[in-house]
Amino acid sequence: MINIKNILIVCISLVMYSIVFSSCKSDDIASGIFEIATKDLVVDVDKESTTVYIPVNSSLTINDWEVDYDKSWITHGKKRNSLVLSFEANPGKTKRTAAIKVTSPVAEYTLAINQYGPNDVVITDDKDVRVKPTSGIGTNPSGSNTIECTWDGSPRPYMTYTVPATLEYFFSGTEVIDYIIYAPTSTGNFGKLKLYTATAENPEYTLKGEYNFEMKSESSTIHFTTGIKATKIKFEVQEGKNNMAGCSEMEFCTKTITLTQQLLNVFADITCSELKPDINDDAIEELPAEYFKRIAYALKNNRYSEWEKEFRVQEYKAYSNNEEWATKLKIKKYTDLDNPTGISVEKGDELIVLVGDTHNQSIYLECIDEETTSSNDDHEYQRPAAHGHTFSLKPGVNKLVMTSSGQLFLIYTADIFSPDAQPIKIHIPLGSGKVTGYFDTEKHKTNEKYAELLSKATHKYFCIRGERIMFYFHTDKLQEVVPHKILPSIDFWNNIIKWEQELMGIEDIQPSQMNNHLMAISPEGSYMWANDYRIAFAKSTLYKILIPEKVMSAKDNVWGPAHEIGHVHQGAINWPSCTETSNNLFSNYVLYKLGKYCSRGLEISKLADAYGLKRSWVELGYSELYMRMQWQLWNYFHRLGNMPNFFPELFKELRANPLTFNNPGLAQLQYAKAVCKVANMDMTEFFERWGFFREVMLMNYEDYGKYMYIVNQGMIDQAKVYMATFSKKVPPIYYLEDRKNGDVGIEDYKVGDVGYYTQFQDNVKITGTPTYKLSGSKITVNNGTQAVAFEVRKGNENGELLYFFNFLSYTLPQTVLVDGIKFYAVQADGKRIEMKEE
């Protein structure tokens, strides 16, 4: 009985406790927090399958609230602070809707779901009207196709054999022309041109504008700020592809304004990025397409997320013509993809692009996809393409169909000094492409913002724009290597480019006149390379170059990228035999500026060996040796302060008077003469040591191409006569060395005991009497530390030079016969002192 009584007491107690606990818990739930913000109660999604996260501010567990809906194309999940909604792709042609009820003991909410169908913007009904000329005349055609072929709608092109060329069109003067579309041919594509117009009120031609179609294979468009009733229009084509002028079709068009007027009844401007004041739902419902209603409601109800809007609505600035500046500066072409949009697309996507005032400038969207290549590797791999399909944009509504997947870049090339080179506002609205974002150091500024944008990126590649360089690297690799900080990386490489640019003397040009960027990509194969439009660092190498501390941890981590960027900049000082070495002037300069590692390149003893064998410059045989010639010049003129602007001035001289690249023997001597001219110095001895004055005839010399490499005695004599016109002679800087054994980064080089640059800097004199001992072919020098080198000559100090060395103990090569020779210690100023045998 006692046990039964006790059991009953325990059971009753448990029931009472459960009732009390349940009551307390219910009270806790009822007084808890469960909130969904008003702005999140309407969910707009595109037609593609997607997942969205609705923020929930809740103190409840996920079991305390319920989600209910009746649509099979929706699924959901619950997290502590969010409702996860997934939507299947909309297969229909129109918007579909749903209601989702979210119920809790604290509050209830109903979410309105709008999943849009395909783009329903129709602009064909308002198709612009083509104004046909009444007649025309042009420069004599190359065949039977006359200028009439440019407006007859046929594929027959009009072509002239020469430029300049003139195309002149006549009109009734009663129809307004708002813009002109030029369709090129397969050759003769227009470059620079002038456009003249006349009207009934002003019957004489007046210059309407100067344009550059850049000889593109795509159509180009000229937009008039205000339409004109032209009586005649004249094109003066100043340059064309292959020195010809060709036109497949010239369309003169009048814009219809119905759609524009409807949009401007609701939106503040044609970019549709802002509503007019006091716009109500009735006005929005009058818009001609569901597409524009979506934009309007998103703006009105604050449902256009700031992240989306930042990239979908932008003002794009003008960038200089990278092709023109490459020619002027003797460099490889920088990128023209300076304006990322942060929008990615898939092949077949329909896009609406809303363009504001273009200020009479031509602009394009370019879609950058991937390309498959194998380069020199044994396997194919992917990398971003240098170029993609371009779409000409006009002010107002543009409807485009993407021909490939990729990211979009706005191409806005102009004379950046022109008052018309103003920023252009463009809106790529909701439902057109997908926001992936990009990071811009000028706009976004902080590492925190970078980390946020990178974490939201949706595309395979993420774009980072700095002052002078752009990265277009794999998103996953950036998230792995630099997930939180990018400013140290971008600043590091901006500095390297800045240093290279200052060495080539364009600090007054870039970025004030030429503001294009260098673009770096991350191929999935190869290693590192440079070409027009981009430089490449393989995806597998990004960990080496994106963290400055990692870059500085190994000499080659700096050298490789600086070498590739040097390829972009070497043009003015390059000729066949130097392609893989003249760029290393920049690499060594970058090492010097960073301050940790010594310079790179073979020792002077290797030059001595080549000299002793009477080898010419082109036959020196070591790429690591060639680079020392330029570096000796830099040390003498820059480091020693003899002419701190020497290389900038040399680059300017060689841009004004370029080397004859296809005649490398001549180019070699042109370079030597240019050095003399800029330095105002007789550099004969310097270039004599480097083999410039040895005859050579190589009929099939290879250096990224085949060349005839000829240097004959007549060419040599002519160069020497020119050099002799300069009264000041160069000191023996061909013996200058800026490294000592044991320097950080010296590697396996044995650089000698004398000739260090400070001896030239201090103009050290030989105060003692250098002596030597010979034991077979081994020579030991005593009291010679004040010399910069030691020479082996026949006869006196002006006798034939057989060999030289910069060690105090050295084994002479077997080609140097010790009988009948003399040894001389060379002083920093060039004085030779005969050494006595002990």
Write out the residue ranges for each language-model feature.
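Bacterial Sec-dependent N-terminal signal peptides
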Residues: 18-42, 75, 105-131, 254-261
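Surface-exposed binding patches on compact interaction domains or structured appendages
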Residues: 28, 33, 55-84
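Disordered, acidic Ser/Thr/Pro-rich linker "stalks" and the adjacent N-terminal cap
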Residues: 117-173, 183-189, 256-262
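Trp- and acidic/polar-enriched beta-sheet ligand-binding modules for extracellular glycan
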Residues: 163, 187-257
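Beta-strand-enriched, solvent-exposed domains that form extended recognition/catalytic surfaces
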Residues: 265-437, 773-837
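Catalytic cores of extracellular degradative/oxidative enzymes
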Residues: 450-661, 671
